[in-house]
Structures are given as structure tokens and as C-alpha cells.
């Protein structure tokens, strides 16, 4: 039987939601992750230090794992102050601020419409060593949804990188060859997370033979040439790329609807799904760096010191999983996952 022991991984982009669903989402992500960076797009958004610390307390109240710890982020708005950034940084629990272009994804209506309005805040973040996380899509109606990421790179991200050369930036959940190339060619302060579902699937999986709503996420799945570029980047050993699931649960009826929500749930099997990708590429030896080393190294945090063991043993993912009083349909529902964490 094939086994693989790696340093305990971290998830550098995770949605846990809030309220009664935390019992389920914290359990799923806390099974084998050491840390997870929790996204702040609640309703209302997590815009202050007090809100972030309160959210952290609610997560910890449901955390049954001695090895799992949430790291928090602030939701960046045009009203965010430099004082708030400094206060957040001083807590030791809030490690980043998240830039959502207004309307780009779930609960992003409070996001930034004019990037220049937050330049003073980016300057403070650069000075304080607070990381900037970016949902890299434009949201103007004249840009096709499949082109939003590429346009963002050219019109928004490139100027930010140029104007703030010391600001550490993570381009979240990249979906295009353009984004992978941008990160590779940028300086050492620019990195990216990549999801398991963007490595395993492309837009054909979502659209051919009937619409599959559980593959619908933002940024949207792209064509297979972009998928292959992401796989190459993730499995290459390049330290600029690391694991961020963007596991984003919605209740089954909110996905299977005339106007369904964006987000795919992978927390039930995240490292197992990544292992499939790396095995398929013959690069299992690079999984540990992607999952366990590159993220903490970029964040200037210590690597985890304990390990987990994966076994090449197929199991069937559940058709549905508990999500508070509702159910969530996970990726690979009712289908085989090739690896299992022992």
C-alpha cells in the first residue's frame, strides 16, 4: 500500500461562514490542517479588529482539534483606517487584509470600487508588514466573466505591485495561465494560492452534459489550457505557489437553484484531492512544499512540526454533509477520492 507522510498542512484561504454551521465547517477543516486563514466576507463583513477577534472566538468555541488554529483577516474597504491596520497587526492573530473588488464574489458588496482610495492603507500595510490578499477580478459589465482575472492583472495588480514594491501580496485562487505567469515573473513579495477544484476541473466539467452547479465558483473555472498551467505551477516546486482551498460552502438548495450561489466545498477532502493532482503529474515529492512549507515561509510563520500520513486507499465522498440545519454537497459527492488521511 502506498503511503505518504508529510508535515501537517495549512489552508491559506478558507471560508467557515458563521453561526450554527461552524460546528460542521470547523470540524471538517480542523481534521488535519494546522492553520487556516479565515476569509472575512461575512454579513456584515469583518472590517474591524474587534469583529475579527470575536469571530475567532466563535470559531475556537467549535474547535475540537488541539492541532488546528484559525488565522484571521480584515475585510478592506474604502473606509478602513491606518489605525485599524496597526491595531489588527498588533494582535498577533490578524495576519492579512483582503481586497475584494466590489461585487466580485459572495458578500463583496462592501468591497473596493476605486483602488486609489485605499492606497494610503496599502502604504500602512507595507510599513507594518501586513499581507494584502487579493480577489483578482475586475467587475465592470463590459468585461467578459472569463476575462476578469486577466484584465485585473493588467489594470489593477500591476500598478499596485509597482507602487508598493515591499508590500507582500497573495493573489488568491488563481485560475489562469496569465495569473500564474504574472506571479512567476513578479518579485519575491508576490505569491498565489491555488484551489484543488481549479487543478482538477475546467469549465467543460461544469457545462458539458448539463450544468453542474457545485462546480460553479468565483473566479469561474476556465478552459483546460489554463487548468494545465495551474497544475504545472502548483506541482513545480516553485515556492511562490501554495495551498488555499477556497472551500466555500453553501446549502444545497442555494446551489441547486435558478440563481445559484458561487462556491465549491472541498474541506472534507482537500489534501486528498491535492494528492491526486500531484500523483497524476508524477510530482508527489513536491506536495509537502506546496501544502506545508511555502505558505508559512511566505507569511514568515514557523512551519508545523508534526505530520500526517496519506494512504493510497479509495473511499467514496458522501452525497451530502451536515451544514448547520441544512446540507452541503461536497466536491466528488458520491464518487471516489483516491487518497485517505489516516
From Swiss-Prot:
One of its GO terms (biological process) is 'de novo' pyrimidine nucleobase biosynthetic process. GO terms for molecular function: dihydroorotase activity; zinc ion binding. Its EC number is 3.5.2.3. The keyword Nuclease does not apply. It is an enzyme of class 3 (hydrolase). The modification N6-carboxylysine is found at residue 98. Pathway: Pyrimidine metabolism; UMP biosynthesis via de novo pathway; (S)-dihydroorotate from bicarbonate: step 3/3. It catalyses: (S)-dihydroorotate + H2O = N-carbamoyl-L-aspartate + H(+). CDD domains: DHOase (cd01294). GO terms for cellular component: cytosol. The keyword Transmembrane does not apply. Zn(2+) 2 binds at residues 98, 135, 173. Belongs to the metallo-dependent hydrolases superfamily. DHOase family. Class II DHOase subfamily. Catalyzes the reversible cyclization of carbamoyl aspartate to dihydroorotate. Homodimer. This is Dihydroorotase. It comes from Aliivibrio fischeri (strain MJ11).
Amino acid at each position: 500500500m502506498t503511503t505518504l507522510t508529510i508535515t501537517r498542512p495549512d489552508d491559506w484561504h478558507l471560508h467557515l461562514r458563521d453561526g450554527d454551521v461552524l460546528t460542521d465547517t470547523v470540524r471538517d477543516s480542523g481534521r488535519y490542517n494546522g492553520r487556516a486563514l479565515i476569509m472575512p466576507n461575512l454579513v456584515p463583513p469583518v472590517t474591524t479588529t474587534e469583529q475579527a477577534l470575536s469571530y475567532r472566538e466563535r470559531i475556537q468555541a467549535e474547535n475540537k482539534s488541539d492541532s488546528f488554529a484559525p488565522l484571521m483577516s480584515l475585510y478592506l474597504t474604502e473606509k478602513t483606517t491606518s489605525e485599524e491596520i496597526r491595531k489588527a497587526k498588533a494582535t498577533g492573530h490578524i495576519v492579512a487584509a483582503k481586497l475584494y473588488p466590489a461585487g466580485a464574489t459572495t458578500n463583496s458588496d462592501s468591497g473596493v470600487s476605486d483602488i486609489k482610495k485605499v492606497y494610503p492603507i496599502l502604504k500602512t500595510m507595507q510599513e507594518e508588514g501586513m499581507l494584502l490578499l487579493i480577489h483578482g477580478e475586475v467587475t465592470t459589465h463590459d468585461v467578459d466573466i472569463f476575462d476578469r482575472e486577466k484584465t485585473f492583472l493588467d489594470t489593477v495588480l500591476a500598478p499596485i505591485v509597482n507602487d508598493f514594491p515591499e508590500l507582500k501580496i497573495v493573489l488568491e485562487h488563481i485560475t489562469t495561465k496569465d495569473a500564474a505567469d504574472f506571479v512567476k515573473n513578479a518579485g519575491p513579495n508576490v505569491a498565489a494560492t491555488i484551489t484543488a477544484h481549479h487543478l482538477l476541473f475546467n469549465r467543460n466539467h461544469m457545462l458539458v452534459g448539463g450544468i453542474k452547479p457545485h462546480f460553479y465558483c468565483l473566479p469561474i473555472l476556465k478552459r483546460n489550457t489554463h487548468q494545465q498551467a495551474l497544475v504545472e505551477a502548483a506541482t513545480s516546486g516553485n515556492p511562490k505557489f501554495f495551498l488555499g482551498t477556497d472551500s466555500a460552502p453553501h446549502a444545497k438548495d442555494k446551489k441547486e437553484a435558478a440563481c445559484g450561489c458561487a462556491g465549491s466545498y472541498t474541506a472534507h477532502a482537500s489534501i486528498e484531492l491535492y494528492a491526486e493532482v500531484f500523483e497524476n503529474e508524477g510530482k508527489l515529492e513536491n506536495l509537502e512544499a506546496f501544502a506545508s512549507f511555502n505558505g508559512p515561509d511566505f507569511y514568515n510563520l514557523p512551519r508545523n512540526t508534526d505530520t500526517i500520513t496519506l494512504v493510497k486507499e479509495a473511499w467514496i465522498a458522501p452525497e451530502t454533509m451536515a451544514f448547520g440545519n441544512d446540507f452541503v454537497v461536497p466536491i466528488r459527492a458520491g464518487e471516489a477520492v483516491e487518497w485517505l488521511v489516516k
